[in-house]
Amino acid sequence: MFNEPTTYYLIKGILQAENDSKQRLGQKFAESLRLKPGPSGPDDGVDGSTCFLGRKIHFQSKLSANFLSKDEARKYYSDIKYHMADISIMLAGVGYKETFLDRLFGHPDINSVVIHLLTLQDLFERSNKFQNALKDLPTLENLDNILRFP
């Protein structure tokens, strides 16, 4: 349930966009976070990265209109390990299936990585999950600025 009807329509509009538009939005998010952007096109599992307080941070945006499944969790875990992240922030369009969570957190070494699984709703409504992620990457505060209207 959305706290504000406007949030629903903003998210709906984003999720109905073409894939290249959603990819550009993910890159805009990374840019707004002052992260080193991932490559255009196939992004090698990273939309942005940086080091903050000596910890390597990985940011990935998957703005799918569907809940992310275990297949996405497999890719995400692999990307976290490949990029040697200490902290990883995933921004999903609508959320995560239980199978995603089971698969991701079923890896015995995953607890060594701080993971923040956010949604567009978390971003727009500045949820508790969003507030917790701010502690690890204060520039997350900038994300909603690219979506605000004057």
Predicted region positions:
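Mixed-charge (Asp/Glu-Lys/Arg
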Residues: 1-150
